[in-house]
């Protein structure tokens, strides 16, 4: 048994429809299709392979301990890129998303999952992998004067599982009140 999981935020359906419209436009206009193979999402923890049922239980338990958070409003605004390979919607680095990602990373650290976790730079990918430099430049030029702005309330996070060569929704972690977190409760408070 070996399963591949992705921890992420998935915007509401109305925003996903807007994002998919942009991704389809880019695919049709520039002949780059790789991003269409994945659901619209904001990665909170890079994909991780888990090879045993016991480790999978520990993984999901650790994630449940990271779900003690208060809802926050997330802003997606305008377009940006990682030079020459990835074009994306910019995701505001607000305290809510930064704290959530930090909690998830901290909760999973004891599992020693050995995934490459770079500095967290939240984004929602529109085109990557199959984007060659001349096409990348054309996409940037096409979108340089375009604007995009959507907000949504984040009240939990998702885990997707790679099944039959596709990422599929697998488990939801709705936020729980941080005051109910047994790990932070003071024994001597009332």
Name each model feature, range by range.
Residues 1-73, 94-148, 164-190:
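Basic, often amphipathic N-terminal segments
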Residues 76-80:
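A short, structured active-site edge motif that brings together acidic residues
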Residues 86-87, 167:
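Hydrophobic residues embedded in beta-strands of well-ordered beta-sheets
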Residues 160:
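Active-site/acyl-donor-binding loops of N-acyltransferases
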